[in-house]
Amino acid sequence: MIHLNRSRSRLLLGCGSAALALALAIAPQQAEAQAINANGTVVFGSAEINTITTNVDQIDVFTDTVVIDWVPTEDGGGNALDFLPTGNTAIFQSTTTADFAVLNRILPSTNGNVAVINGSVISQFQNVSGPTVPGGFIAFYSPTGLLIGSTATFDVGALMLTTLNTTDTSFQNFAEFGGNLALTGAPGSTARIQINPGAQILATPENSFFAVVAADVQMLGSARINGSHAYVAGEVVNLSFSNGLFDISVPVGTAATGQVMTLDGNVGGPSSNGLGDNHMIYALARASQDPISMLFTQNLGFDPAQSAGIVNGEIILSANHNVFGRTVDGGSISDGIDAVFGANSATSDVQADILIQNFTATSSLLAISSHNTDLTAGVLGSSVSGNLLLVGRARASMGSSFGTSLTVSGDVLVSAQDYGVVSSSLQNLDVINAAAGNASIFAGTVSGSSIDIGGNVLVAADAFAGADDLNRIAGSALAGQASIVSSRGDIAISGNATVSARGIGTSLPNIQSGATVRGGLALFAADTAGTILLDGNLNLSTDAFGSLGSLFSPSSVSNAYGGQSRLSVQSGGGSIAIGGDAFASASAVGGSSNNAGAGSIGDAGQAIANINDAGLINITGGLQLEADGTGGANAGGTGGVGLGGRASSALFTGGTINVGLGFNAEADGLGGTGQTGGAGFGGIAGAIATIGDITIGGSAFASAAGLGGGAFFGFGGNGGLGRGGNAFLQANGTLAQTATLTVGGDATASARGVGGDGGQSDGQAIVGGRGGDGYGGEFTLPNQADPAFNSGVFI
């Protein structure tokens, strides 16, 4: 039984066969002063329907669960009158328990009109030894839709509005025993529940709830609930409720199309009192045949907590995902920025999007969709008190573009990550591949647009490959784009910021069939006079890691290609200030393999810190750039080639880069081990001011080494070639404009080449192999990372 004045459900037998035998079937004649414009028949349990005064009906409830079928009163044309007109009141009352439940089935009129409630609904417990208090769970079902008018008020223990039917037994099981409530709509129904502006819904007992379930849900009124809300758009829906937490699954999506969920009112309630008093707002929709969207505006969330350490409540918005308590797609809102939503549990492939704008959220918020999740400050500005988690498989974005502000007091996660499936019972191998989307934070377009984040930030478009674990087949991983950009706007972050677009091979060992992995784009940039102020550390990562191929059984390569990690001020200028260290990485590590040919390639990308126009990058700590390429180990042949990428900081047409501590740039190439060592080729690493000023407070180090791999497997193999690349610490200038590079400590640039170790002798017929050749960077040779530049060392 759902206890509205307790935080834990009681599992006691309620309305059994003996109680059913006492059920009353009362169908009073329509009276002129009757409040409800319908004739009611009690079809389950025991209750009595009376008109106690003019326009006031009272339903006295004698059993824990009651079901009443209502036949609407019609006009001469077959149209239903308002079920509860303005000024009329329906009172549901029990003198035996505050935990009674009443399901009101409003049957269709001749013309199938929407059922309209404009009056007042009250449910209460009349304690003979105490005052009357709100209590009871009241449900209204109408298959043709429900309209809650602007004059309607509800003062209840708990409330459900639905266009989906249920059985008497299922309703009793939910109400009395905390079981599953199975709700089923007519196939293809698009019936809507609309709650108009001005409508007031109040449920004050602790552990209350308010549920709205239909093909189309439009919540435009106000609901203040001392517990949890659930707004669900679907055709078949399962609900269970315990300790303030809903489990919500939608086996069949809504037949409605377009915007099927709108919360554009005041949705909230008092704060949780602490452990066991869970306050949640849920909104779910599942698509069926046609694309759908969900819109959230105005006010969401609960009152501030009265004591430190208490979470006042949480908000979960979900498109094409079921929800279990606080968990969606394998991740929990309570885990904040560390949550991982990688269970591949989307319930539909049909597009379902979420849009949040012009809103105030007074609790932590998670919005997750199978496709696009977008949050914008809108023309009115927006705010979140708590953490903000935005997850969209194709796109997740957070922005302010209308000259208004967007503030978040806690941490922010913006994720378009993708996870390949790992399974031994696959129907389609495509699902083991991962292709991430686009994740972004953006402020700009209109001057005055701003974003202020009080905690840490993670913007992620990583791709995590899956695998067929029966046949040991690896999936591919293609990272997306992750960015934090201020363009004519202002972004302030009080904590650390991580921008990640990595390509990660499967972690399943002993892979036999490898696949390619690629890093994407990680961008932290200002342009058009935009500004970014980051108090903590910055981490940009577009690394790529190949899968772990078997070294004992035959296995194919998993080539890895690093992406682009960019810290930059772009056209139109701007400024970036980082209070801690800055780290950018676009390294690549080829996967292991066992084949007679070459091993996996490790081809690094670009890790750069540039100003392309007049502007400023100021880093209080150190700056580290890494674009190392490591070839994969190959037990059956030649080790993989390792290709260093570009790790550089540059000024092109002016501007200033200040680094308070040390500067380190690495673009090394490391050949993989094999029966013959793989070759390693250095890339391009360093710092250069063509025009402008670079100041490094500590030491500066640039390395573009080429290191050959060793002949580790078998006997007598030769080591791999090691060829150095291009390393530089330079200031050029022109006849008209100056350039300076100032280093406060040691300055080192290295483009060494070191051959790999030869294989060992078997002590008998096979002699030890020779070491690989090593060549330092040579100016006569174009660099493999960018043939427009020759190799060598330049200071």
Per-region residue spans from a language model:
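Extracellular and secretory-pathway beta-repeat/beta-biased strand scaffolds
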Residues: 2-795
